């Protein structure tokens, strides 16, 4: 329960700060990762967590995160968030039953794949929103009529038209 509460607090806070400022201090990951390590040390001492499996899962998650970051699929905060989640949730939370009864031995990978699916679903939300703009007498492409159709299709699922004043600049 404590791990889930810490994760929800961490993700809620980091999402809120990201939306407000687009910048997030590395201290967030250090604090929550540190708290996760304290819990892990206690659980290893109490005999409810295998040190070998915990270290293996965290190291594998860190290697995967840093690889994704190195090849450009992650940014720094994404990699740190994934590593921190691996520390907080090295294994499936007890008491929460999976929908299909299948539990991955590498739970952080499950978290990652679910976040990829959630991120992809955001593209569907953007598509519906952008297709509805003409119904509101607004245009996504005003001033961009000369752009090729393929670029407009990409913008339909990835773009969000906002006023210049709402974008934080340097």
Predicted region positions:
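A membrane-topology feature that recognizes alpha-helical transmembrane segments
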Residues: 1-170
């Amino acid at each position: 329960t404590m791990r889930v509460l810490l994760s929800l607090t961490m993700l809620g806070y980091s999402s809120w700060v990201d939306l407000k400022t687009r910048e997030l201090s590395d201290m967030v990951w250090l604090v929550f990762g540190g708290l996760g390590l304290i819990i892990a040390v206690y659980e290893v001492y109490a005999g409810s967590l295998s040190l070998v499996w915990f270290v293996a899962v965290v190291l594998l998650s860190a290697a995967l995160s840093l690889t994704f970051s190195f090849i450009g699929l992650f940014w720094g905060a994404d990699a740190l968030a994934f590593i921190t989640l691996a520390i907080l949730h090295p294994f499936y939370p007890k008491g929460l039953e999976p929908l299909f009864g299948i539990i991955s031995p590498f739970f952080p990978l499950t978290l990652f794949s679910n976040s990829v699916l959630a991120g992809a679903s955001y593209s569907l939300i953007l598509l519906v929103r952008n297709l509805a703009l003409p119904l509101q007498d607004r245009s996504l492409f005003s001033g961009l009529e000369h752009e090729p159709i393929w670029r407009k299709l990409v913008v339909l699922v990835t773009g969000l038209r906002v006023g210049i004043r709402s974008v934080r600049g340097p």
